[in-house]
């Protein structure tokens, strides 16, 4: 689990988005950022989470909130995911695991009694100054936007 705490400076990163463009956290200084980590493109829980952010994206933008999704999937996978579900926000391809490791969300998981390494679904809300305002570890994949907005208000 994350070793970061509320109030900590959010770790800086630069990564490729779904189109191969370099995106850094510093680009969003002055805005609130919902940085959400998810295990895998096009899986049921991850799709529900992304679609909820999609469905509420205009409300988030109207409040000055940027949404960035992060998984270890590559750019091509992200492009398919975005196209299939009409996602309006940026997905970062953390193929070298540098962001998931910096944020402490890469770790051991268990499914059907088997242990494996993977991304623990976690959402960070980063304030306008680049500090971690909130960390959400118990994400409701069907209503993550409501969880985020409840914390921000």
Question: How would you label these PLM feature ranges?
Answer:
Residues 1-153:
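Chalcogenol-based redox active-site neighborhoods
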């Amino acid at each position: 689990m994350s070793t970061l705490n509320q109030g900590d400076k959010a770790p800086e990163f630069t990564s490729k988005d779904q189109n191969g463009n370099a995106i850094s956290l510093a680009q969003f200084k002055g805005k609130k950022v919902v940085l959400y980590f998810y295990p895998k493109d096009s899986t049921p829980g991850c799709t529900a989470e992304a679609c909820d952010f999609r469905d509420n994206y205009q409300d988030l933008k109207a409040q000055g909130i940027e949404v960035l999704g992060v998984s270890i999937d590559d750019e091509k996978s992200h492009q398919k995911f975005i196209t299939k579900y009409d996602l309006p926000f940026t997905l970062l391809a953390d193929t070298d695991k540098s962001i998931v490791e910096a944020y402490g969300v890469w770790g051991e998981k268990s499914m059907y009694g088997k242990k494996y390494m993977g991304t623990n679904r976690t959402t960070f809300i980063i304030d306008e100054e680049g500090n971690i305002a909130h960390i959400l570890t118990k994400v409701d994949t069907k209503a993550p936007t409501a969880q985020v907005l409840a914390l921000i208000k």
